Amino acid sequence: MFAQPYDHSFNDLFNQYVNMETSAADGKDSALSDFDQLFPLDSLSSDCGDLPPTVSTPKRHQSPQPWSNDWSLQNDGAAVDHFAFHDTVHPSAISDVNLNNFEVPSRPTATHALSTSPSTPPATPRRKPTQSALITPKSIRHRSPNERRSHLRKQSFSPSLMRSSNLSKSRMAYPEAWAQQIQNFSLHSSEDRLPLSPPPSDVLIQHENMPTEHIMNQPRDSAEMPPQYDARLYHQSPSVSCHRRTSQCQHASNSTTLITKLFHLDSSSPSSADDMFSSSHSSDPHSISSWQSDPLHASSLSFTPDLQGQDSQWWSPMPSRVAQQQASYLESPTPVRTTQNVGNQNDIMQGGLMIQFNPSYDMSADHSFSSSNMLPATPQKFDTSFTTSQIHNVSRSPSLSPKAGTSPRDIHNGSISKPTHRRTHSRKLSGQSMNAPKPAKASGSSSRGSNKSVSVSFVNFTAHDSKKILTGVAPSGSSKTKARREQEARDRRRKLSEAALRAVRSAGGDVEALEAVLC
């Protein structure tokens, strides 16, 4: 019946309570046969391995002495108290404890459960825990209470499960309330969209995104559900806390068949809604402080991406679905609760792994949804808001990084004037650098008349070479030969003029009158 890696403490506890109910003098032998058909004790003891059930089976071995029967009953009760009211009891174990329709009588709990001495005959010696292995034919090994206590501490999943034991002491001992809680558990565990161990933010989002048809149709399957459960389940107040959801989802695949079979055996009348829902409110002070108990509004479901497998969507043309959506709108006033739900939606989007929207874009879309309930004009409003924001983004982006392909119609004149200034300035600089050697050539041509400046003009490896080479363009070979030939012609004319003047002087002529006539 059970898989091998399942909880051993759950098997032990269930086997104890089956045996305790058969040993009670109520005459419920039919229930015993039903339990033996459902859960044979051989398979339970063989599946458990190192941790077998710790109580002997009274069906297999009935002791002839009446005091030993009382002792085994008292021993079972002490072990029951030790298991049921321990600090770290599993919540699935508590649910199965209270399913079996018996209440634990008020008896003193013993710390060492298996070492209690019998009370009726005073001359009987103290029974040791190791002797109980000789009673059963299966030779079941017993463990000391300290080892069981350490094993239970290892099996506990989280410290938040400690509050469930106090629950079972005060209010959860009634089988009627637990029957309704098992029904509620079967309703919640039948969802296929819940993962095995989700983070708390994802659990909240998935419970928010539950479709309204799914929630409203599930309580109608059971005929004995009173009508006030529909409103409580539909509004989704935090009646079932976060850690109980995760623990129920973890053990839903293993213990669903067990719980449903036990639930069919127990035909009890349903209790009121206060017995069922007020206990989790009073026992879970640390459940979720930021989660408000407002009913789910449709605007909080608007932008979540988990709309893939759901049947009811915003644009569904079915008239029944539209009527249900409008009824959900009419139940609570919209303008008061839209702001709270928007805040909750932003918190959840920041906490979980979801796409974050711009707050202005988010608020505008929410108000367009909440102002017009199911009118066909809402997608038009939504599209216009989206397109206007897109246009603004397009007009802002070229001002930051202008491109050459953008037309000046979409861009302001001031944003494109600065790059043109820079381009003209760079062109002016390049023109000056190209025109820079021209004044150097002009200065060289103006210095041709003087004799001294010609010899100094193009000389390498001097202090003034940097200015001449870097500012102007270096002369080519043809220009050098041309300048050399011009220099040689000037030298020849100068020498000829000097020789003519010497000849005139040697002949006794007037040189100054000749220069005045020639010049």
Curated annotation (Swiss-Prot):
It comes from the Eukaryota. The keyword Transcription regulation applies. The gene is wetA. Residues 105-165, 270-294, 301-320, 325-344, 389-452, 470-495 are annotated as: Disordered. Residues 419-428 have a biased composition (Basic residues). Induction: A huge increase in expression is observed between the fourth and fifth day for solid and liquid cultures. BrlA, abaA and wetA are pivotal regulators of conidiophore development and conidium maturation. They act individually and together to regulate their own expression and that of numerous other sporulation-specific genes. GO terms for biological process: conidium formation; sporulation resulting in formation of a cellular spore. Belongs to the wetA family. The keyword Transcription applies. Keywords: Activator, Conidiation, Sporulation, Transcription, Transcription regulation. Residues 155-165, 301-315, 389-400 have a biased composition (Polar residues). Residues 108-118, 435-452 have a biased composition (Low complexity). This is Developmental regulatory protein wetA. InterPro entries: WetA (IPR040112).
